[in-house]
Swiss-Prot record:
GO biological process, one term: histidyl-tRNA aminoacylation
Entry keywords, A to Z: Aminoacyl-tRNA synthetase, ATP-binding, Cytoplasm, Ligase, Nucleotide-binding, Protein biosynthesis
Keyword DNA repair set for record: no
Keyword Aminoacyl-tRNA synthetase: yes
Protein name as annotated: Histidine--tRNA ligase
Protein location: Cytoplasm
Length: 430
């Protein structure tokens, strides 16, 4: 029986040629990940890696009424009956690590991660049961300009990777004073419309009132649009804090829109919440989001510590880049040696190792196909340079390298070819 992938997961590999699955090409993922490392380094963030699975209670602080905890977690018992869960989101494990490793001894902790997440989600476009997320978490400082800096990093990443038509949507949920005031107003409003709400929103009315604003159910939309906006009820301190964030974004020319219905899907958010929205082919959708979560660390058993961060789904980022037409796979290797005859094998083996030591990515074609066929394969596999080696090259000590991209070639001694290859690789944008 043929083995096959489970539903909701996929392979990332370098030999994809059809447009539909091009987003799974290894080189595209490498390019996005390289941008992440570079941009996060510019802002002083360091990479953190947490285990694929955690004790299940780590994720209960995400919110027992959230969709993740209620129906999307991959939870299992180990051989000793302990409940463990595959990581469904990035923030809770980093909070656990922060507490476990006593990182509160530092005033300011800035992390980023690129990690797989696991959620048992309904099959739909852009949603996968294993997906990959880039996120940042800044723990220890509460300041409106720190929040603006997080948004600037988000915007910088989108610009650097090449995404177009981006906008950030913002809302401010406020602190304890604001939330208590607004909860009372919102409860009275939804109580008047309770009979018309969806079953899910009726459930949220008793468990997590604010999440009704996040409902996607058709029967809720008109009621939600008429709901009183939270920004009408924020305290003076909250309004001042939010205004300072907006002024900072204006100073950086970051495009934003205030969305008074935005609440996010996880229960731990306080104060600032945001989503990054793109428009592609007349369709708008979120590519990531986040906000401030000043109460999560204390509720997880750590010291009261402010924090802010975001998460971005990389599958949608790469798919959107391809849809916007400015993203193509990179060549998978720079130079391919083709020993035309078996007596050239040893030469190619030794020279390839020397070329690699010089920093020239090199592959050897050991299939001994006819040269015409070997060149076709090299072209199909996006080799940038090809160098056939046979008896003539060994005797004359003159080598010819074909530039497959430019359809040009150059010749010379081994040392001359090495210098030309180094120059070409350093000065060619692929």
């Amino acid at each position: 029986m043929k083995v096959a992938l489970p539903k909701g997961v996929f392979d990332i590999f370098p030999y994809i040629t059809d447009a539909k699955h091009m987003w799974r090409h290894t080189s595209l993922w490498h390019r996005v990940e390289d941008v992440i490392h570079d941009v996060c380094g510019l802002y002083g963030f360091s990479e953190i890696r947490t285990p694929v699975f955690e004790k299940s209670e780590v994720f209960l602080h995400v919110g027992e009424q959230s969709d993740i905890v209620k129906k999307e977690m991959y939870t299992f018992l180990d051989k000793k009956g302990r409940s463990l869960t595959l990581r469904p989101e990035g923030t809770a494990p980093i909070v656990r690590s922060f507490i476990d490793n006593s990182m509160n001894q530092r005033d300011d902790n800035k992390f980023y991660y690129i990690l797989p997440m696991f959620r048992y989600e309904r099959q739909q476009s852009g949603r996968y049961r294993q997906h990959h997320q880039f996120g940042v978490e800044a723990i220890g400082v509460r300041h409106p300009l720190r929040d603006a800096e997080i948004l600037a990093l988000l915007w910088h990443f989108y610009s650097a990777v090449g995404l177009q038509h981006m906008q950030v949507q913002l809302n401010f949920l406020g602190g304890e004073v604001t939330r208590k005031r607004y909860d009372k107003i919102l409860r009275e409003y939804f109580l008047d419309h309770l009979s018309s709400l969806s079953l899910l929103s009726k459930e949220r009315f008793n468990t997590n009132l604010l999440r009704i604003l996040d409902s996607k159910e058709p029967e809720d939309q008109e009621i939600i649009q008429s709901a009183p906006p939270i920004l009408d009820y924020v305290s003076d301190d909250d309004r001042k804090y939010f205004d300072e964030i907006l002024s900072a974004l204006d100073a950086l020319n970051i495009a934003y829109d205030i969305n008074p219905r935005l609440v996010r899907g996880l229960d731990y958010y306080t104060d600032l919440v945001f989503e990054a929205i793109t428009t592609c082919r007349d369709h708008s959708y979120a590519l990531g989001g986040g906000g401030r979560y000043d109460g999560l660390i204390a509720s997880s058993g750590g010291p009261a510590t402010p924090a802010c961060g975001f998460g971005i789904g990389l599958e949608r980022v790469i798919q959107t880049l391809l849809a916007q037409g400015n993203f193509t796979p990179l060549s998978s290797h720079k130079l391919r040696l083709i020993p035309v005859e078996s007596q050239a094998d040893s030469f190619c083996f030794v020279w390839a190792q020397h070329l690699r030591s010089l920093g020239i990515p090199t592959e050897v074609d050991w299939t001994h196909k006819k040269l015409k066929n070997a060149l076709k394969i090299a072209d199909a596999e996006k080799a940038t340079f090809v160098c056939p080696v046979g008896e003539r090259e060994l005797v004359s000590e003159q080598l010819t390298v074909k530039n497959m991209s430019l359809r040009q070639e150059f010749s010379g001694s081994k040392q001359e070819v090495e210098q030309r290859l180094l120059y070409e690789i350093q000065n060619t944008s692929l």
